[in-house]
């Protein structure tokens, strides 16, 4: 039986390396609180999601389990994809004459090519050793470009929730790691909304650490 072009594309993509999601979520499934704004980019109460990171690299050179998880997360990543909501600002529409340059200042922490999904075209933005390329023709195009940049390394889907959900629904993710914080947000940007019931996750590991549980899954295709 002949495969469709989309199926062939997915197989070629997987041969090049993994597509990985790593994201912090509340117990009720939110990766950001309600009413995200420039003042509160993670929404109301969303900053509590990342309190577990305060425990990383304890004084005296001690480590906890989260240090090991984060080191593994950052290894072998050649490119990253994010949505406009993660790049910012929270407002939408055309970029304008003096477009937003991201939340991270002139030296972003990525140090690799980043592809930003947006509905509005924009020229690439170079800040230090990070190049932001703005992609307006869909997630498959963004992944194809990220793969070309990453080579044999993995592609990291950074967020937000809507972008991750689109990639999961399209069957384009190989691994998902959830950093589950012991809080409830009650609303906001929710992971897995609209993904459907056909996505099967196989547990790879579960690690408990201060203020967080790290749950890693393989997406069964």
List the predicted regions and their residue ranges.
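Enzymes that bind and transform nitrogen-containing heteroaromatic metabolites
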Residues: 2-221
């Amino acid at each position: 039986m002949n495969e469709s072009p989309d199926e062939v594309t997915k197989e070629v993509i997987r041969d090049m390396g993994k597509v990985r999601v790593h994201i912090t979520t509340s117990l009720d499934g939110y990766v950001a609180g309600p009413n995200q704004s420039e003042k509160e980019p993670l929404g109301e109460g969303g900053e509590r999601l990342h309190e577990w990171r305060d425990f990383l690299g304890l004084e005296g050179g001690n480590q906890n389990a989260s240090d090991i998880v984060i080191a593994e997360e950052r290894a072998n990543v050649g490119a990253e994809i994010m949505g406009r909501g993660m790049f910012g600002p929270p407002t939408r529409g055309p970029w304008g004459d003096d477009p937003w340059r991201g939340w991270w200042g002139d030296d972003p922490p990525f140090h690799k090519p980043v592809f930003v999904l947006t509905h509005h075209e924009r020229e690439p933005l170079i800040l230090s050793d990070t190049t932001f390329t703005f992609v307006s023709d869909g997630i498959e195009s963004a992944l194809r470009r990220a793969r070309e940049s990453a080579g044999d390394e993995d592609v990291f889907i950074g967020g937000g929730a809507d972008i991750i959900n689109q990639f999961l629904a399209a069957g384009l993710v190989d691994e998902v790691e959830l950093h589950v914080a012991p809080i409830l947000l009650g609303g906001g940007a929710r992971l897995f909304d609209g993904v459907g019931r056909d996505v099967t996750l196989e547990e790879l590991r579960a690690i408990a650490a201060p203020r967080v549980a790290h749950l890693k899954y393989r997406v069964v295709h």
